[in-house]
Amino acid sequence: MQFMIMQTLLVQALDAACRKAEQNGLVLTMEQRQMLCVQREQTLRNAGRLEVGLGVLPALIETFSQSPYLDKRNAVQELTELQQIFYAAQNLTHDTLRDADLLAAMRSLYDGLCGGDTAELAAQSEEVWRREAKKHSGR
């Protein structure tokens, strides 16, 4: 029962995030949203993580839909890679960064230093994540 409630809340949060993303030109179909949810579960398993609550996916969609570098034609793949990077960075920093701060740091690096290159973003060190997140903390 609790699982069904969380799934319903996740779907509602995704719908709200996707409505906001549409304002930035990112339109995700229901099939693409479902694919992102499946990828989310796989990413969590691969990262050895368990997520309580709605997780980062809705906020990640909202945050990166504003990026000029996000390839809207290949958004599911890029958003999946960004989810993987988020959880890898959380593991690397031992979950000491707030989700919002890490997302802001990711976006700053993705749009700046990395020029939209997810491989470059994934290669960042713990020190870089901490420094960038600190710049964005409390916003």
Each model region followed by its residue ranges:
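N-terminal interaction modules that seed assembly of large macromolecular complexes
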Residues: Q2-L57
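Arginine residue identity/basic-tract feature
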Residues: R19, R33, R40, R45, ...
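Amphipathic alpha-helical binding modules
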Residues: V76-R139
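Charged, low-complexity interaction regions
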Residues: A21-E31, N46-E51, P68-R73, N91-L97, ...
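Generic detector of well-ordered alpha-helical segments enriched in charged/polar residues
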Residues: Q7, V11, D15, P58-I61, ...
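Short, charged early-sequence alpha-helical segments and their helix-coil boundaries
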Residues: L44-E81, L121-S125
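Short intrinsically disordered terminal tails
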Residues: M1-M4, F64-Q66, K135-R139
